[in-house]
Amino acid sequence: MGGLLIKQLSTEEDRVVVIRFGHDYNPECMKQDDILASIAEKVKNMAVIYVVDITEVPDLNSMYELYDDCPTMFFYRNKHIMVDLGTGNNNKINWALTNKQDMIDIIETVYKGARKGKGLVNSPRDFSPQYKFLKKKKKKKNKKKQKKKIKKIKKKIKNN
């Protein structure tokens, strides 16, 4: 299987090859597979998507450090394209994305960068844990502001 996969990587000339490694029975892989299947038609001119069971490609497991539940990697003309997601690991996405548009945007960025000869591209969105924490904190502040506004409106209505 590993040889067949490498052959496929070398024969695809015009599109990015997106490979989700893992196990079909893994819940994280199932989530990622749903996202990938739902966007496959939208990205068909930019990318071809494969899912690969890591037990069938043991030689690639150590080569690409496929130890996470659901690593997704990108290749263009048999060259590994890295993506800076803000996580510190530029080799692969090692979690299941929850947003279809995020995956489409990443594939588009990889496609455009790879066609220009870049081996590393910057993700259009920051996925760093620090960013996620700040985003949650901001949402809490916004909720508090909304509650205050609602209280003021209720008081005005009550007084009138």
UniProtKB/Swiss-Prot annotation:
Claim: Ion transport is one of the keywords in the record: no
Key words of the record: mRNA processing, mRNA splicing, Nucleus, Spliceosome
SMART domains referenced in this protein's UniProt entry, alphabetically: DIM1
Compositional bias of kind Basic residues: 133-160
CDD domains noted in UniProt: DIM1
Compartments it resides in: Nucleus
SUPFAM superfamilies listed in its UniProt record: Thioredoxin-like
Gene3D superfamilies the UniProt entry points to: Glutaredoxin
Listed GO CC annotations: nucleus; spliceosomal complex; U4/U6 x U5 tri-snRNP complex; U5 snRNP
Record-linked InterPro entries: Dim1, Thioredoxin-like_sf
Chain's role: Plays a role in pre-mRNA splicing as component of the U5 snRNP and U4/U6-U5 tri-snRNP complexes that are involved in spliceosome assembly, and as component of the precatalytic spliceosome (spliceosome B complex).
Subunit structure: Component of the precatalytic spliceosome (spliceosome B complex). Component of the U5 snRNP complex. Component of the U4/U6-U5 tri-snRNP complex.
Name of the protein in question: Thioredoxin-like protein 4A homolog
Species name: Dictyostelium discoideum
